[in-house]
Amino acid sequence: MALVPYTDSGVQSLKRFHDSSASFKFVNHNIEIKQDWKQLGVAAVVWDAALVLCMYLESEGIHLQNSSVIELGAGTGLVGIVAALLGAQVTITDRDLAMEFLRMNVRDNIPKDSLHRVSVRALNWGKSLEEFSTYDFILGADIIYLEETFPDLLQTFLHLSSQQSVILLSSRLRYQRDHDFLEMMKLHFTIADVYYDKNTDVHIFRAQLRQRKEL
């Protein structure tokens, strides 16, 4: 998730994001996520798309036990934390500026005997991808929103995906450009809208690389 600096405009409708922390319960764990809108902006608060994806992972029988998982644009790290609590080996990523913030949330919410299954790494989409391998699951919550990042995000998906990889994208489709990105993905991936939460207007999309004969 891109780091956007704090501005005063429009934040009155986003009062909950100004709380220094947010509490949740997933996988029978009480999770306390620190937030820092003022310093890190949209990357440092919990958005609806992250909550919907966490609920989906827990309630829809997604088998993450011992799977390799990477979260892109992790922001607060909530999705990656829940994936780890579900038994996955998780790499939680965002830009360099978010690293210490992410590590703090991971340390606060992952049991000490499970910390070895979680790594926090900087990943700028489209750059230094050779440092990363493929993963069983690639997760992203509200990462489809800056059009200038779309080519790099698509390149990152392609690098991280094998034929068996599953991408789960949770997003509120606010603008035409969001739909356009999904169309870009369809050139390389099969995509299905697998879940819709009407209360938050958030969709979850499941994507997998097309078989070579389909390209």
From Swiss-Prot:
Cellular compartments per GO CC: cytoplasm
Superkingdom of origin: Eukaryota
Ranges in a coiled coil: none
Gene3D superfamilies per record: Vaccinia Virus protein VP39
UniProt-annotated binding residues for S-adenosyl-L-methionine: W47, G73, A74, G75, D94, W125, A141
EC annotation from Swiss-Prot or TrEMBL: 2.1.1.-
One Pfam family here: Methyltransf_16
Listed GO MF terms: protein-lysine N-methyltransferase activity
Top enzyme category: transferase
GO biological process: protein methylation
Keywords: Cytoplasm, Methyltransferase, S-adenosyl-L-methionine, Transferase
Compartment annotation: Cytoplasm
Task performed by this protein: Protein-lysine methyltransferase that selectively trimethylates residues in heat shock protein 70 (HSP70) family members.
Family: Belongs to the methyltransferase superfamily. METTL21 family.
Protein name: Protein N-lysine methyltransferase METTL21A
